[in-house]
């Protein structure tokens, strides 16, 4: 997550110029062979720079042009910087992985930067209800400003039972924006059950980020309820 000012551009870059304010992202360049190929790690070889990854702890970063996105010069730097990672990660899971549509129901476990971004995008897409799950009442209240229509404090009630009761059977999509084993395992049973027939699939659980080293999932969620993970 970083905000900076462009100091130099390559000959093939036409969307940026020296002096532009820009954010750097983890979005890879467009695939030309059907596969998403990550550029090489940033390094030098025989005193020649090898561009590649995004580095935001240094004074300068050499990145592929597709990683840098122009923003308004007066954009607040502390706010604009998180767009490149947290916002794209949370919002992207809603739009590209789940492909949420209007009136579909959503639950988001964890309302930090990534979770808030998922909630906000679900609101933009007119999902309903949008259920925020966390342990902190203050964060849950804040989530309402981003579009959450309902909240569940998982330290006070069983979130799985609460969401199933709240929705009458489960949500269409559940997102884990925390990455703990307990949330890895909770997001699947809170999705709605499917039924017989290839088109009567159940809800989808979306893990945003890396899973924990271990998790236990009942196979019946897939076999009998046609839920998706």
Report residues per predicted region.
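Glycine-rich beta-alpha junction loops
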Residues: 22, 26-29, 67, 179, ...
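Glycine-rich beta-strand-centered segment in the early N-terminal region that forms part
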Residues: 1-32, 72-74
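Glycine-rich cofactor phosphate-binding loops and adjacent beta1-alpha1 units
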Residues: 98-101, 135, 141-228
């Amino acid at each position: 997550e970083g905000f900076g000012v462009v100091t130099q551009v390559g000959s093939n870059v036409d969307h940026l110029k020296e002096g532009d304010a820009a954010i750097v992202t983890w979005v890879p360049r467009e695939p030309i062979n059907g596969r998403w190929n990550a550029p090489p790690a940033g390094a030098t070889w025989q005193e020649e720079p090898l561009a590649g990854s995004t580095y935001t702890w240094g004074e300068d970063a050499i990145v592929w042009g597709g990683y840098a996105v122009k923003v308004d010069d007066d954009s607040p730097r502390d706010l604009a910087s998180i767009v490149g990672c947290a916002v794209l990660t949370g919002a992207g899971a809603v739009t590209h992985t789940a492909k949420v549509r209007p009136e579909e129901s959503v639950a988001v476990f964890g309302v930090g930067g990534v979770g808030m971004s998922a909630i906000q995008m679900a609101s933009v897409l007119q999902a309903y209800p949008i259920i925020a799950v966390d342990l902190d009442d203050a964060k849950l209240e804040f989530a309402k400003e981003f579009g959450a229509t309902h909240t569940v404090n998982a330290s006070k009630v069983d979130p799985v039972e609460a969401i199933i009761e709240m929705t009458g059977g489960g949500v269409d999509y559940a997102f884990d924006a925390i990455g703990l084993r307990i949330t890895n395992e909770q997001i699947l049973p809170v999705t709605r059950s499917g039924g017989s027939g290839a088109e009567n699939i159940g809800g989808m659980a979306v893990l945003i980020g890396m899973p924990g080293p271990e998790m236990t999932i009942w196979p019946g969620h897939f076999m009998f309820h046609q839920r998706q993970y």
